[in-house]
A protein has these predicted regions:
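Conserved H-loop
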Residues: 71, 140-144, 215
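Conserved Lys-Pro-Asp/Glu-containing loop-to-beta segment of HAD-superfamily phosphomonoesterases
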Residues: 156-187
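Helix-loop "lid/cap" segments that line or gate small-molecule binding pockets
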Residues: 58-73, 133, 162-165
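Metal-dependent phosphoesterase signature
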Residues: 65-111, 115
Length: 229
């Protein structure tokens, strides 16, 4: 942890979803990409081989469609339809969602909430999909708002939007901290100029995350709570 950094001292916290709050033990979101592309464009396209961890749904779609030979102009024109279809697909299959909470995440969120902290989701998921995951995991009531992919595409844009929303509620001087599980979360937080806590509950190890110099790095929420102020 950076010397002098009190991880729970910020006014608001932006939490990534996948790998930070929960890990999905289902393929609903995964198949929604393929099925939505097939429905809208009539082509078979897989997300296999496309980096997904730390990416955004729009970023993943763009990479898949570029690989299939589409130009950005064509992608941009069809994205709204594909996004709508993806959300509808996950909505239809919401009962199959099987999120597994990361260690001590409820206790961590409650620790912050009882101290009056404003909590937000800040995720590369499409908004409908992100909220459905949190709802199925039982976490939805803990978050005041969220910032998601589409029309935003870059993770830094998603974080900046979340910061803006937090400061609209709390005032322009409100302090905000990001909590995530990937190097992309760390890098995006640096771009927007806020502290970042990395938790190694996704695919990246503690050492891999620590190499990107977050303000604090922990193996899981249990360890984070041990350093609560």
């Amino acid at each position: 942890m950076r010397p002098g950094f009190r991880w729970d001292s910020a006014d608001a916290f932006l939490f990534d979803i996948d790998g930070t709050l929960l890990n999905s033990r289902d393929a609903v979101h995964y198949f929604a990409f393929r099925n939505a592309i097939r429905h809208v464009l009539g082509i078979e396209a897989s997300i296999e081989g496309v980096p997904v961890h730390g990416n955004t749904d729009v970023g993943i779609l763009r990479a898949v469609l570029q690989r299939a030979g589409l130009q950005d102009s064509a992608i941009n024109a069809r994205l709204p339809q594909i996004v709508e279809q993806m959300c509808a697909e996950v909505q239809r299959n919401r009962e199959q969602l099987n999120p597994e909470l990361c260690p001590s995440i409820v206790e961590l969120l409650m620790h912050l909430q009882t101290r009056g902290k404003l909590l937000s989701a800040a995720s590369g998921n499409l908004e409908t999909i992100g909220w459905l995951k949190l709802e199925k995991a039982g976490l939805r009531p803990l978050f005041a708002f969220g910032s998601f992919s589409f029309p935003l595409e870059l993770r830094a844009e998603i974080f900046q939007h979340g910061i803006d929303l937090a400061r609209q509620r709390l005032g322009k001087l409100a302090s905000v901290t990001v909590v995530g599980d990937t190097p992309s979360d760390i890098d995006a937080a640096r771009i927007v100029g806020v502290p970042v806590i990395a938790i190694a509950t996704g695919i990246y190890s503690f050492a891999e995350l620590q190499a990107h110099s977050p303000d604090a790095c922990f193996a899981c929420g249990t360890d984070l709570l041990a350093f609560a102020g």
